[in-house]
């Protein structure tokens, strides 16, 4: 079996993948050649938070501290599909140089940490972050039709595993006017199986089976479940009839429940003193939250 470091080296050599980004030392743009419209040096450029920020970094740390992609503005007609290449980051907590998800937007949030990915799912009123009422939504991922990703230059990080920042290279975020799900996968030999990008019309419940209940705010550990779209060793491809049912959700454990979530400063933000993916002894995320 490959170790993590050996696998990353092999992939980098074969596919030309660049080294992981450190969120404390981001360039202005990570994909300027691909036509990136936003920025990645967000704290330096925008400060703690800015309602006009065009930040394209996402942080998924806990049920209280996560971000989602949303349109930078609305014209009353554009859909998620129209704007997927230029989406910007909206976060529950300040300190990342992003826009804020307004209090009251999120109606339910269910955070799951597994050995292979972190995931946040739920419902809300995303007209508050410029998604049109009635928009059934679309998928954001790091590849897109051109290979530059949607949004172009989008980067995802977490500190849920070690307490220090770790880039999650494979991810998927489905956003509609009323529902969201975001799964971000750790680097490894099966990251594209846990975070596939070929089921863009199947939506949240099929791609990320989980709890979506309104009025519930929970944080759990858990198991991954099954690879989306793979049944008895065979891969189903979107559009082939019949359409199979979603895989069952993995098992949850160690759940903590909260009455609500709200804006406020993040407990920890990227700093030039931080070290990427250094394993340290740490208390659970919910014990750190105020």
Swiss-Prot record:
Residues 1-19 form the signal peptide. The keyword Nuclease does not apply. Disruption phenotype: Results in a thickened cell wall with altered chitin composition and leads to secretory defects. Decreases virulence on maize; double knockout of ROW1 exacerbates the effect. GO terms for biological process: appressorium formation. GO terms for cellular component: extracellular region; nucleus. Keywords: Nucleus, Secreted, Signal, Virulence. It is found in: Secreted; Nucleus. Residues 266-290 are annotated as: Disordered. Plays a role in the formation of the appressorium, a specialized infection structure with the purpose of penetrating the host surface, and is required for proper remodeling of the appressorium wall and vesicle secretion. This is Appressorium protein ROW2. It comes from Mycosarcoma maydis.
């Amino acid at each position: 079996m490959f170790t993590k470091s050996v696998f990353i080296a092999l992939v980098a050599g074969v596919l030309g993948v660049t080294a992981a980004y450190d969120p404390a030392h981001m360039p202005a743009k990570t994909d300027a050649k691909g036509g990136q419209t936003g920025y990645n040096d967000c704290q330096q450029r925008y400060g703690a938070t800015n309602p006009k920020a065009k930040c394209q970094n996402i942080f998924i740390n806990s049920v209280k501290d996560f971000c989602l992609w949303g349109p930078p503005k609305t014209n009353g007609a554009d859909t998620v599909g129209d704007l997927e290449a230029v989406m910007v980051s909206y976060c529950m907590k300040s300190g990342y140089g992003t826009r804020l998800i307004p209090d009251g937007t999120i109606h339910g949030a269910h955070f799951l940490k597994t050995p292979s990915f972190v995931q946040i799912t739920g419902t809300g009123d995303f007209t508050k972050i410029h998604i049109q009422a009635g928009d059934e939504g679309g998928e954001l991922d790091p590849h897109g039709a051109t290979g530059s990703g949607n949004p172009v230059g989008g980067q995802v990080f977490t500190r849920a595993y070690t307490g220090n920042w770790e880039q999650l290279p494979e991810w998927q975020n489905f956003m509609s006017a009323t529902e969201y799900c975001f799964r971000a996968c750790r680097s490894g030999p099966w990251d594209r199986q846990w975070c596939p990008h070929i089921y863009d019309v199947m939506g949240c419940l099929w791609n990320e089976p989980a709890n979506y209940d309104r009025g519930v705010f929970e944080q759990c550990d858990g198991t991954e479940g099954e690879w989306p779209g793979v049944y008895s060793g065979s891969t189903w491809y979107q559009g082939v009839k019949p359409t199979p049912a979603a895989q069952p959700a993995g098992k949850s454990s160690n759940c903590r429940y909260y009455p609500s979530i709200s804006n406020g400063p993040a407990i920890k933000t990227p700093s030039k003193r931080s070290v990427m993916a250094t394993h340290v002894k740490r208390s659970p995320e919910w014990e750190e939250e105020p």
